[in-house]
Every structure is written in structure tokens, then in C-alpha cells.
Amino acid sequence: MKKIMHVAEPFATGVLSFLVDLTRQQVEEYEVYILYGVRPLTPDNVSNLFDKRVHLIKIDSFKGAIGTVFNFKAYRDVRRWYIKIDPDIVHFHSSASGFVGRWALPCKKLSAFYTPHGYSFLMRNGTKFKRFLFWLIEYLSAKRSAVTIACSEGEYKEAMKLSKRSTYVNNGINTKNLKSFVRSISKIQHPIKICTSGTDSLSEKSQTF
């Protein structure tokens, strides 16, 4: 059975839910491993969210985006687990994982993929220097051999500015599983209220991503 190794420094919120859904399908055909870091929003029971066949490997040297990029031990740890697992496919998630993974591993010799999950340099609530630093991280990482898989068309357009080796798969849920719950309704004649929940962050503005 072929192996997939995911590298996810920010193992929380959107990246976490993305991996829960993705690996649920992958374990039917692959051995799946996830190298992850703990963030303040990482659930205590995170292992209970995944299929028992998923191998979760906590990486202590993953300490936030910037802290990980400038931590030599993070590169060594990713490299060490890569050699031990010997995966056929590697998928990096978010900026720090993408930078560390693409520079620590021989991407030209393997099937390597990177998903930004929202480019940090586009955030509106950070300083100019911080946005520039994240842009530089993405710019340098894009020089390595890996295919960027964006989560939306907007993110794909930004990815193409960094690397032509880019594509996108719209992020969302499989509506086929919801068809049995959908009922026909008549045209609404009055205003309706819609409530949504999620991370309160300006970096996730819909018009940007």
C-alpha cells in the first residue's frame, strides 16, 4: 500500500477540519501519516477526530509559523520522519509547513504538493513587515519543485503569481451526502437571516480568499 505523509504545523481550525475530511477518504487506499504541531486552538482530543488508521505524529519543534521557519530542529525533524516513513506522496499545509517541507525534502524526487489554506501575506490585521515576511517565505518556497493546490479560485490566482505549477480544488463539503436532507421550498417572499460561525479573523475575508 502506498503512503501519504501530510505536514501540518497549524493543526487547528480550517486546516484541521480539512485534514479530517481528506484523510477519511485516503485511508481506504493509502497508509496515511500526519506530522503536526500544536496550536492554542488545537483540541485536546484531536486524535479522536480522525480515523484510527491515520498515524498522528506530534512534532514538538513546530512552534507557530515564524517560530517554525526559523527553527533548524523543525527541518531536521521533518527530514527524519520522511526518511523513516518513506512516503510516495507528501502534502504540506500552510506557510510554515510549506517552507520547511519544501526546503528540507528532495521535492524533485517525489510527488510533493502544497496547500496555502489562505496566504498569510494577504491578511489585513498584520503589520507591513509581517506581511512582507510571509510573502518572502512563499516566494522562496515557490522556487522548489512542488505543485500548489489552492482552495479557491482567488487563492489560485495568487498562487499563479508565485508559481505556474499551481491548480485549485474548491474547498467545501460534498453536497451529494446532503441530498437526502434537502426538501423543495417555495420562493421566499421576505428577508431571511443567515448565521455562520468560525474563526474571527480578518485574514479569512471572503472577498480575499
Positions of PLM-derived features:
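Active-site proximal beta-strand in glycosyltransferases
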Residues: K2-M5, P106-M123, E138, I149, ...
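N-terminal strand-loop element at the rim of the active site
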Residues: H6-F70, E155-M160, Y168
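Short His-centered aromatic/hydrophobic patch
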Residues: F92-G98, P116
